[in-house]
């Protein structure tokens, strides 16, 4: 996958379920949500940066430490190799892998899913609604 495509998909994912607090620091996006989910509590080294790489990593670590959160980086193939190497030297480890699958939905209709006890339906939305948010909060045990 090309870097431009990765960037476009990552922007969609970042905005799909935003963090409670967000800081932009020299092209990096720092998300803070009290520890609920990696995606809402991680550092996206997303855009081009100009500051010294090691100083940026130390700054980010301090920001998360102040909130008693681990500094977690969302890494993709588009991330500069120098950052990956620096994080490894500083003792960071790969903790979780995420596969992002995508396809064109133009002209696609969701099949009705059925099981003996229930009748499920796939609903495609452009924005989350209250019912969806409440369900997600119950699944990951966030007070609602």
What are the functions of these language-model segments?
Residues 1-66, 79-80, 84, 142-144:
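N-terminal charged segments
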Residues 1-11, 39, 44-45, 98, ...:
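Short amphipathic alpha-helix that is part of the acyltransferase structural core
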């Amino acid at each position: 996958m090309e870097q431009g495509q990765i960037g476009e998909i990552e922007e969609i994912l970042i905005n799909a379920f935003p963090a409670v607090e967000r800081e932009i620091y020299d092209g990096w996006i720092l998300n803070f949500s009290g520890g609920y989910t990696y995606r809402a509590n991680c550092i996206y080294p997303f855009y081009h940066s100009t500051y010294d790489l090691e100083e940026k990593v130390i700054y980010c670590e301090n920001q998360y430490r102040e909130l008693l959160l681990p500094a977690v980086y969302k890494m993709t193939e588009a991330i500069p190799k120098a950052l990956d190497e620096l994080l490894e030297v500083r003792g960071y480890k790969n903790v979780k892998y995420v596969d992002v699958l995508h396809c064109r939905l133009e002209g696609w209709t969701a099949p009705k899913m059925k099981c003996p006890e229930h009748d499920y339906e796939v609903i495609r939305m452009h924005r989350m609604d209250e019912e969806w948010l409440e369900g997600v909060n119950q699944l990951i045990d966030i007070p609602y």
